[in-house]
């Protein structure tokens, strides 16, 4: 039995290969997305790395919640310091402990390019380390936020280990009187983690795995034979979760200018793979390429830069405030466990630890080997108030199936795009010109007059058939797909939270089926061999137009995220070129016309001979032959008119693409139906397509498929899955409910675009199956409950006790539709009327409140609530400043709110305000956050009233407590000398929920909330207690 050609452009092979190619790409992408590469055996690990030890460390530090404002935080800090000492001693490292901190850096930083290091200053330095225990540094700053600028005072307690590099300066150079000149060599690498968790999570992924990774880096780089060339600083910072405070306090370290590069390890999910969230430049991305399992792309970096992703990490402090260059490696999935009690060791794995650790190890090792000039020198922005980290190169980077890494300059992508914009139309124009010159340009060819013998005959080529099919089908399929997005967003927008793949299946199946229905239907009505070529031409035009905008984005906006378009543009051009070159297999149009006309003449002569020889033949047969000049064929088809002798609708030569019936010109039809010509039998057209199309090659489509699909779909498909995983569960955080669904809809269209040139050849089995998939997923997506035990609805808790009003209110913040069922499951609010107000910062969320007077917090070992906060205030004699003394039991965090703006503040014993972290707003501010490292020491805060002046007395007046004070109705608009009182509200926060008796209202919520819901903290404190005073 003779087997057919498996690559012929027929329904069977096309259905098989298009399905196989897409599945061969998508299935591995999903596998990479859903799995983590296994960790190597202990024997295969780098020297000094022990994953068993790392796992035990993780279990120890995640035994309890350990936010900055908890005693467990101190225990975790002490444990990590003790483990660092143990590792150094085990590796035989002579280390010292340094208490240096609070170094006020000058505003001008030096670089080795401006002040070259003398050869005598640097010599080979032996192995060694210094452990910095910083309990000195504090920072005073303002934190500009839209409509809510606040002052901040923070006392840090970071610790960090400086691993001496072989080319670092000798001795304790950071104690030098001229430390800037010594540190200017600036080749040190900062590796950062934060050891605090949120008050509602155990912090396994955020950020425990990062910190135990730093311990393993310490063990590796202090092992024999692994001393780095450049020094490495392993920073364990505190209070990142509450405002990036630890990284800001590191700004007062004597080593901050020594570190020109950094590796920040973070967690915004709970396990899975650690992704390269963002990086500052190409050089840093190339350092990451040494990772055994790289994962990430420049798209995330561009999204952060444009504010599409608003999550903040210590990366922003190192880059924006210090001017360092480096990268952010972070866990990102599943976000439903982020900042909840499910961020624990049970929901992660050793494999995830290894994925982050291996990336950090490879990147740090690469950065520590760089020369002092690669990341050191004058900045491209010319700023002298930041670390002189050299001139970065904008880049593009992405991974291939989590196994390999591509990184190249953004200028290279721009050159690629520009080359495509200029050369591809020229090449296609030249090829088209050559085809026209050789009379082989069949696209848009209508008819050719041919003279054979004594007569002249017109031969039709059907060169416009199929021209408008693709844009029409694309518009309709896109409109229906986007319409389904809005339908889901209206009815059940959070279904993507737990059933992302169901949403993907719905969008892909809908676009596929509608595209096939329209394109296959058009081909059935008016078969055309040019449909594939026309679709490819449209694809090329679309990508060329989009590339114009991409070039502008690359050149003017430094956006590398458009790199998938360059792939599609390149391959669309190559596919169109193949379709044009295929026409060289056809005869010249005039030759074909003469051939057809000659055959027609021979046929007529043969018919006449037959008539003369058989004059008594049936009259109907004679009549049918006479009608051969006008009818399509003697045999009725689905396009034959119902009434004999009547032309079908749309039978003229100027028929539309989607005509219901049609008639072919005589010569074309005769060639298709004539059975007596051996040459035509050798090249039969497919399914009544144009007669000349039989000579076209039937295998070139497969090359076009392999050009268009594999690389482009791999690159875009990876981004599509990451997009769904990253933002699919952000709706409960207050983000847009439409954006994740719209992302899936648009990306589904873009992923299937390369299939459209071939889809009209797909047999009905595949699209009908996908139609059933669409019906099933549509019903499921519209009706299914969006949350489950593994994908729990996240809501936010806060309890406020107002000592002046005597109120105790619990606020549950979230999407009201689901918060109300949560409240109904809790005993305390039973019977209460629950009122929900709009969140002032996140319009999608609501604050639903209920009275919790029956569950007062016990945050200070039985102390009465009224005695927890002590506050006193006095004004200066001239009425221009206020001194506030504030203390609270068993907490490190308090806030001061003022009834009208103040125009300056200072904390006794604190540093002056640091302009690196924000300027003071000209309109003043009305809130100050106060953080301390100790549990007993109070705050003495001086408030500068600026233009507001309180009544002037000879002696300072002490403030009096009030039961209840209304806010200043004037909004703080006081004039100098106005007799107006200042109302100061102290709000102190408690965050330690490790004991159920401490915050019983919180534990009641945890105990009785539905299985499909999970609670997280709303603000820094799970409990806030407020107390007001007035200064008259």
UniProtKB/Swiss-Prot annotation:
Membrane-traversing stretches: 12-32, 416-436, 470-490, 494-514, 533-553, 561-581, 702-722, 739-759, 767-787
Annotated Acidic residues bias: 599-608
Entry keyword tRNA processing: no
Residues with site note (Transition state stabilizer): 338
Cofactor(s) this protein requires: Zn(2+)
Biased composition annotated in UniProt, kind: Polar residues: 651-660
Topological domain ranges for the Vacuolar compartment: 33-415, 491-493, 554-560, 723-738, 788-1032
SUPFAM superfamilies reported for this sequence: Zn-dependent exopeptidases (SSF53187)
Membrane found in the keyword field: yes
Cofactor note: Binds 2 Zn(2+) ions per subunit.
BP terms from Gene Ontology: proteolysis
One GO CC annotation: vacuolar membrane
Pfam family, one: Peptidase_M28
Binding site for Zn(2+) 1: 194, 206, 266
Topological region Cytoplasmic: 1-11, 437-469, 515-532, 582-701, 760-766
Superkingdom of the organism of origin: Eukaryota
Annotated positions binding Zn(2+) 2: 206, 241, 339
Annotated stretches, region: Disordered: 595-688
Function: May be involved in vacuolar sorting and osmoregulation.
Family of the protein in this entry: Belongs to the peptidase M28 family.
Protein name per its UniProtKB record: Vacuolar membrane protease
């Amino acid at each position: 039995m003779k087997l057919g050609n498996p690559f012929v452009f027929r329904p069977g092979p096309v259905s098989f290969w298009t399905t196989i190619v897409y599945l061969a790409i998508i299935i591995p992408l999903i596998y990479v997305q859903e799995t983590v590469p296994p960790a190597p055996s202990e024997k295969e690990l780098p020297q000094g790395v022990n994953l068993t030890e790392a796992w035990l460390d993780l279990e120890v530090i995640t035994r309890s919640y350990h936010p900055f404002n908890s005693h467990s935080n101190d225990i975790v800090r002490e444990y990590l310091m003790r483990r660092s000492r143990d590792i150094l001693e085990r590796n035989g490292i002579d280390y010292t402990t340094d208490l240096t901190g609070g170094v006020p850096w000058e505003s001008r930083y030096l670089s080795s390019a401006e002040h070259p290091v003398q050869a005598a200053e640097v010599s080979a330095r032996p192995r060694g380390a210094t452990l910095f225990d910083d309990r000195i540094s504090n920072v005073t700053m303002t934190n500009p936020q839209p409509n809510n600028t606040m002052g901040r005072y923070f006392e840090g307690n970071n610790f960090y280990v400086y691993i001496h590099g072989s080319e670092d300066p000798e001795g304790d150079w950071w104690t030098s009187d001229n430390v800037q000149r010594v540190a200017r060599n600036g080749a040190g690498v900062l590796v950062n983690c934060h050891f605090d968790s949120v008050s509602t999570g155990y912090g396994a992924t955020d950020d425990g795995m990062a910190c135990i990774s730093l311990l393993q880096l310490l063990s590796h780089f202090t092992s024999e034979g692994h001393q780095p060339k450049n020094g490495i600083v392993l920073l364990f910072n505190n209070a990142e979760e509450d405002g990036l405070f630890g990284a800001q306090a590191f700004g007062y370290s004597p080593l901050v200018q020594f570190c020109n590069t950094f590796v920040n390890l973070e967690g915004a999910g709970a396990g899975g793979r650690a992704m390269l969230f963002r990086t500052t430049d190409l050089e840093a991305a190339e350092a990451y390429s040494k990772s055994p399992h790289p994962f990430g792309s420049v798209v995330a970096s561009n999204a952060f830069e444009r504010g599409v992703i608003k999550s903040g990490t210590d990366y922003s402090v190192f880059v924006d405030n210090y001017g360092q260059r480096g990268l952010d490696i972070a866990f990102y999935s599943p976000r439903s466990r982020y900042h909840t009690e499910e961020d624990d060791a049970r929901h992660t794995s050793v494999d995830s630890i290894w994925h982050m650790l291996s990336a950090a190890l490879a990147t740090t090792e690469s950065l520590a080997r760089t020369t002092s000039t690669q990341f050191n020198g004058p900045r491209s922005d010319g700023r002298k108030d930041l670390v002189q980290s050299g001139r970065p190169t904008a880049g593009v980077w992405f991974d291939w199936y989590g196994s390999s890494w591509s990184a190249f300059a953004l200028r290279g992508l721009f050159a690629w795009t520009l080359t495509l914009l200029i050369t591809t139309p020229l090449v296609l124009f030249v090829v088209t010109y050559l085809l026209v010159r050789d009379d082989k340009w069949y696209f848009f060819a209508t008819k050719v007059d041919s003279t054979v013998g004594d007569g002249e005959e017109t031969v039709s080529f059907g060169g416009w058939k199929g021209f408008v099919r693709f844009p029409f089908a694309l518009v309709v399929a896109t409109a229906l797909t986007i319409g389904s997005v809005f339908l889901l967003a209206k009815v059940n927008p959070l279904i993507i939270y737990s059933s992302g793949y169901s949403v993907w299946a719905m969008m892909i199946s809908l676009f596929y089926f509608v595209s096939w229905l329209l394109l296959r239907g058009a081909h059935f009505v008016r078969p055309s061999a040019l449909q594939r070529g026309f679709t490819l031409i449209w694809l090329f035009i679309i990508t060329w137009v989009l590339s114009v905008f991409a070039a502008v984005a690359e050149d003017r906006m430094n956006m590398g995220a458009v790199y998938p378009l360059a792939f599609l543009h390149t391959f669309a051009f190559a596919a169109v070129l193949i379709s044009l070159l295929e026409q060289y297999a056809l005869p010249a149009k005039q030759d074909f016309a003469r051939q057809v006309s000659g055959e027609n003449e021979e046929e007529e002569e043969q018919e006449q001979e037959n008539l003369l020889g058989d004059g008594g033949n049936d009259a109907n047969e004679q009549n049918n032959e006479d009608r051969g000049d006008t009818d399509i064929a003697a045999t009725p088809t689905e396009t034959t008119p119902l009434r004999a002798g009547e032309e079908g609708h749309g039978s003229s030569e100027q028929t539309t693409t989607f005509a219901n019936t049609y008639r072919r010109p005589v010569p074309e039809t005769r060639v298709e139906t004539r059975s007596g010509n051996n040459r035509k039998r050798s090249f039969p057209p497919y399914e009544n397509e144009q007669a000349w199309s039989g000579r076209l090659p039937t295998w070139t489509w497969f090359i076009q498929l392999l050009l268009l699909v594999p690389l482009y779909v791999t690159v875009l498909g990876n981004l599509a899955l990451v997009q769904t995983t990253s933002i699919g569960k952000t709706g409960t955080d207050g983000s847009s409910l439409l954006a994740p669904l719209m992302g899936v809809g648009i990306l589904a269209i873009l992923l299937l675009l390369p299939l459209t040139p071939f889809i009209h050849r797909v047999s009905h089995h595949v699209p009908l199956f996908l139609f059933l998939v669409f019906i099933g997923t549509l019903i499921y997506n519209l009706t299914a409950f969006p949350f489950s035990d593994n994908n729990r609805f996240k809501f936010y808790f806060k309890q406020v006790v107002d000592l002046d009003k005597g109120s105790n209110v619990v606020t549950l913040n979230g999407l009201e539709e689901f918060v109300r069922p949560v409240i109904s499951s809790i005993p305390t609010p039973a019977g209460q009327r629950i009122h929900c107000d709009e969140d002032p910062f996140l319009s999608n969320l609501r604050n639903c409140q209920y009275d919790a007077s029956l569950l007062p917090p016990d945050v200070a070992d039985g102390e009465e609530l009224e005695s927890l906060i002590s506050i006193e205030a006095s004004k200066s004699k001239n009425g221009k400043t206020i001194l506030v003394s504030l203390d609270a039991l068993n907490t490190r965090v308090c806030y001061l709110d003022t009834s009208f703006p103040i125009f300056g503040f200072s904390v006794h014993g604190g540093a002056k305000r640091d302009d690196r972290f924000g300027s003071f707003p000209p309109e003043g501010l009305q809130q100050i956050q106060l953080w301390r490292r100790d549990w007993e020491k109070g705050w003495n805060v001086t408030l500068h009233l600026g233009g507001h002046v309180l009544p002037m007395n000879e002696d300072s007046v002490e403030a009096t407590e009030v039961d209840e004070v209304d806010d200043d109705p004037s909004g703080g608009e006081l004039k100098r000398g106005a007799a107006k009182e200042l109302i100061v509200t102290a709000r102190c926060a408690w965050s330690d929920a490790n004991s159920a008796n401490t915050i019983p209202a919180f534990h009641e919520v945890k105990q009785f909330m539905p299985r499909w819901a999970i609670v997280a903290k709303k603000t820094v404190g799970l409990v806030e207690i407020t107390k007001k005073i007035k200064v008259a």
